[in-house]
């Protein structure tokens, strides 16, 4: 009896881990961090705890819902790609119908929380972000154009705006700049990974840029977008949204990103693709942390 109970307990634990994996927790964590920064930058003082709690809960559940829907829609593609073939749906560890119900349930709960406990505008924007990622990007753009990640990246760039609007109820230029920062960051981030995984994408029939236009062209695009990102990152300082701490940090981080992109471009192979991809994650996290540090230092000095 004890052995049977232990086996059942392990089975339940494994099942919950598979549902947890459906939500892409690492991606959701970065989304929540950028949304939190949007919240904290939106006001000079403290954000009301209930707005922060329910705002992040709703945004996080919506992001996890979109991730789970992505698992469901891409299950056949995932099965032929080395990077994704061990996910719960391709391996049969989780039934597609259960995953779909789980994804929809999270989305419904997320919308309910945002409408009832935050504000309608945040709920509407979050809904559009969810549909933009799970439907427009995953179903259409990803499968039809090498510019998929450019236009599809807008949905993934919205979390700072969602956080800002959750607190203020308004759309202003400052959160739109944060959206622009992530929007321009997205192509070099994903294309660096796509260079390394191009054979995977080709096997799955996904028209990622390295598959359709070649590695050399993609490397050049990574460099050009990184230079564009460096320029965009200076705009918050130019419009007096940030101070000198941000300016110095943004320049240092941006030059570091350009260095990685330039090294990738000059390399005769793809050896620097994953280091560039890794730095891109560090860059975005550090940039948003830098925005917070600059914000609170300027508040203390005011």
Swiss-Prot record:
Q: Which residues cross the membrane?
A: 27-47, 53-73, 100-120, 121-141, 149-169, 175-195, 215-235, 237-257, 273-293
**Any one GO MF annotation of this record:** protoheme IX farnesyltransferase activity
Q: Supply the enzyme class, top level.
A: transferase
One of the record's GO cellular component terms? plasma membrane
* Family classification: Belongs to the UbiA prenyltransferase family. Protoheme IX farnesyltransferase subfamily.
Its UniProt miscellaneous note says: Carbon 2 of the heme B porphyrin ring is defined according to the Fischer nomenclature.
Keywords assigned by UniProt, alphabetized: Cell inner membrane, Cell membrane, Heme biosynthesis, Membrane, Transferase, Transmembrane, Transmembrane helix
Topology with regard to the membrane? Multi-pass membrane protein
In terms of Pfam families, this protein maps to:
UbiA
The Enzyme Commission number assigned here is 2.5.1.141
- Where can this protein be found? Cell inner membrane
Known function = Converts heme B (protoheme IX) to heme O by substitution of the vinyl group on carbon 2 of heme B porphyrin ring with a hydroxyethyl farnesyl side group.
Q: Does the keyword Repeat apply?
A: no
Chief location: membrane
Is Cell membrane there in the keyword field? yes
Pathway as given in its UniProt record: Porphyrin-containing compound metabolism; heme O biosynthesis; heme O from protoheme: step 1/1
Q: Name the InterPro entries for this protein.
A: Protohaem_IX_farnesylTrfase, UbiA_prenyltransferase, UbiA_prenylTrfase_CS, UbiA_sf
Tell me what this protein is called: Protoheme IX farnesyltransferase
Specify the species.
Answer: Thioalkalivibrio sulfidiphilus (strain HL-EbGR7)
Q: Which reaction does it catalyse?
A: heme b + (2E,6E)-farnesyl diphosphate + H2O = Fe(II)-heme o + diphosphate
Q: Which GO terms describe its biological process?
A: heme O biosynthetic process
